[in-house]
């Protein structure tokens, strides 16, 4: 989009995910496993980090929660629930796995 700026980009095997300066995320490329189906945000929420894996995408939200979409053959989009007071601070998607850094 003309006039839209991006703050982060991550390339997977056949898809790319971008973080826009307004806190929304967009993805393009092969969507065979739903890796480009970025979940909509709740009001007042934004994405703060994006990471594209092999056939999945992981996103960090402004409230410290994480969400993922796409291929789940190895459980790579299963995001563990956190105890109260703990949040995710960083996300990274590998070929068939996801790494989530916690605040504790």
Predicted regions and their residues:
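Residue-level detector of Asp-centered blade-edge/turn motifs that repeat once per structural unit
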Residues: 11, 21, 52-53, 62, ...
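An edge-strand/N-cap motif at the start of beta-rich repeat modules
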Residues: 4-7, 27, 68, 79
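Intrinsically disordered, low-complexity proline-rich tandem-repeat tracts
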Residues: 18-19, 39-41, 59-60, 80-82, ...
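Short glycine/serine- and acidic-residue-enriched loop/turn motifs that recur at repeat junctions
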Residues: 29-41, 70-83
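Intrinsically disordered, low-complexity repeat/linker tracts enriched for polar/charged residues
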Residues: 6-8, 15, 35, 40-43, ...
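Conserved core positions of repeat-based scaffolds
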Residues: 15-18, 27, 56-59, 68, ...
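Low-complexity/repetitive intrinsically disordered segments
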Residues: 1-9, 95-104
């Amino acid at each position: 989009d003309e006039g839209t700026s991006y703050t982060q980009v991550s390339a997977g095997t056949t898809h790319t995910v971008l973080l826009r300066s307004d806190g929304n995320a967009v993805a393009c490329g092969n969507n065979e496993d739903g890796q480009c189906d970025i979940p909509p945000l709740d009001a007042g929420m934004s994405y703060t980090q994006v990471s594209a894996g092999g056939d999945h995408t992981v996103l960090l939200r402004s409230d410290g929660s994480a969400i993922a979409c796409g291929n789940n053959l190895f459980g790579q989009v299963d995001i563990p629930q956190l105890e109260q007071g703990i949040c995710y601070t960083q996300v990274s998607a590998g070929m068939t796995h996801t790494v989530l850094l916690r605040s504790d």
